[in-house]
Regions:
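Aromatic-lined, polymer-binding surfaces characteristic
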Residues: 1-94, 105-132
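Short, mixed-charge aromatic SLiMs
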Residues: 2-4, 43-51, 95-107, 152-166, ...
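Active-site-proximal structural scaffolding
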Residues: 13, 64, 97, 124-127, ...
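Hydrophobic packing residues in well-ordered alpha-helices of helical domains and bundles
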Residues: 35, 90-97, 146-153
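Terminal, non-catalytic domain-edge segments
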Residues: 133-223
């Protein structure tokens, strides 16, 4: 389907690239054109300081974390593994990913709140996918300790899981903090809510990893 439907000039390009990268990883074959085109356009859309535009324009939302940066680094990792031309951009994108994760850690207030910015806020703390992914990759900046990320993300989850978050059958309701269906965008459904689970990426770390075993640390805004 991704080959029949032309993606719009936005983060959608990365979905086509990701599907082709998955085919390359699992079958050894793919159409490289969507991959190279998505990379070309996002290089052009980079705005600086770890932020990409969602298309040509800058949008103040969390799509750098929901889609753009995590999927770019994953596509580039597959390209690097399979020695695809253009994979050398991996190192550049990795530094941008780490920079954005650094900023995300600083967005978390002492109370565990964070700015409600732009669309798709019904994905709740999935907004911290980049911070979670960089933690899982064990590539946090030196001045950010894994334990402070653990404590910060835990505080966010405890703060945000308000009454009304789940329905009577245990499914996530639409909302940001509790049940707020009016916050849902037209493309959001109950299934979309589960993008919030990307905050759990550090669960991929071993049980004896420093992320889990180190003593609690204050995160930046608490310090």
């Amino acid at each position: 389907a991704s080959r029949r439907i032309k993606a719009s000039e936005s983060n959608w390009l990365i979905f086509s690239a990701t599907i082709e990268a998955a085919l390359l990883e699992f079958t050894g074959e793919c159409d490289l054109k969507p991959i190279h085109y998505a990379l070309k356009r996002h290089k052009e859309w980079y705005k600086g300081d770890g932020w990409y535009g969602d298309g040509r324009n800058f949008h103040l939302d969390y799509y750098n974390s929901y889609v753009i940066q995590p999927m770019l680094i994953d596509v580039l990792a597959v390209m690097k593994e399979h020695k695809v031309e253009g994979a050398d951009f991996y190192d550049v994108q990795l530094q941008r990913l780490i920079r954005y994760a650094d900023q995300q850690e600083k967005m978390i207030s002492p109370e565990g709140t964070y700015p409600v910015l732009g669309r798709s806020m019904g994905y709740r703390f999935g907004a911290f996918q980049v911070l979670a992914q960089v933690s899982w990759m064990k590539l946090l900046p030196e001045h950010i300790k894994p334990a402070q990320v653990r404590c910060a993300l835990t505080k966010v989850m405890k703060r945000q899981l308000a009454k009304g978050t789940f329905d009577k059958d245990g499914w996530l309701n639409l909302g940001f903090c509790g049940h707020q269906p009016e916050i849902a965008d037209r493309y959001v459904s109950t299934g979309s809510n589960y993008l919030c689970t990307f905050i759990f990426l550090p669960l991929g770390l071993q049980a004896d990893d420093e992320f889990w075993t180190a003593k609690p640390e204050k995160w930046s805004s608490v310090k």
